Amino acid sequence: MFEYLIKFYPKIFFIVEGTLVTLKYSVIAVIFGLVIGMLLAICKVNKNRALRLFANFYTSIFRGTPLLIQLSIIYFASPYIIGIKFSVFMAGAIAFSLNSGAYVSEVIRAGINAVDKGQFEAAEALAIPKFLITKDIILPQAVKNIFPSLVNELVNLIKESAIISMLGEMDLMRRAQIVSIETYNYFFPMLIAACCYYILVMLISFIAKIIEKKMIVN
């Protein structure tokens, strides 16, 4: 056992390096997912029926199908559907962002509906353009209300990003799998990967609590 730990020690760093890859996908997905989610949420509360139908249909597709299937379609089927072969990174970033956008849109929609409608009516009475009402009055309050839910989405993205290993990306999970095959031991590599995921989630949760407290004070 002791000899194995000495032999396994250098491979720990190889696994931990995958943390950066996991973070890269998660951060990109949460940024673009937030943008997509905001646009969809605005469409969902819009009076235009066509926009509402489109946003609801989009959400139903990405919430109603597994992320693994979405990733597979974007990576393997895109050359046949749109004639473009995406790299593993692009396919992962697109799939995670589109999927995240669907979930974030529902969170933001709920946040928008939670804002007192009297503020919207008062702003309209002052002849403030609807775009500015949404951008400067409604969305800032909505984001403040839903901040914990957005953090939860980032946490979910960190864990769900492990499926990118299916395409051979050298993330935490893929590196742990490689070490498992090389050492004929699945316990320690997966334990190291699990610890890395746990530390990432705890760190993000800690930072989020600090930010949330400052938002409450402000």
Curated annotation (Swiss-Prot):
GO MF term (any one): transmembrane transporter activity
Domain ABC transmembrane type-1, chain residue ranges per copy: 19-208
Topology in membrane: Multi-pass membrane protein
PANTHER family found in the cross-reference section: GLUTAMINE TRANSPORT SYSTEM PERMEASE PROTEIN GLNP (PTHR30614:SF20), MEMBRANE COMPONENT OF AMINO ACID ABC TRANSPORTER (PTHR30614)
PROSITE patterns: ABC_TM1 (PS50928)
Family: Belongs to the binding-protein-dependent transport system permease family. HisMQ subfamily.
Name of the protein: Putative glutamine transport system permease protein GlnP
CDD domains named among the record's database cross-references: TM_PBP2 (cd06261)
Function statement: Part of the binding-protein-dependent transport system for glutamine; probably responsible for the translocation of the substrate across the membrane.
Sequence intervals crossing the membrane: 25-45, 57-79, 86-108, 187-207
Keywords from the UniProt entry: Amino-acid transport, Cell inner membrane, Cell membrane, Membrane, Transmembrane, Transmembrane helix, Transport
InterPro entries with a match to the protein in the record: AA_ABC_transptr_permease_3TM, ArtM/GltK/GlnP/TcyL/YhdX-like, MetI-like, MetI-like_sf
A Gene Ontology cellular-component term: ATP-binding cassette (ABC) transporter complex
Gene: glnP
Listed GO biological process terms: amino acid transport
Subcellular compartments: Cell inner membrane
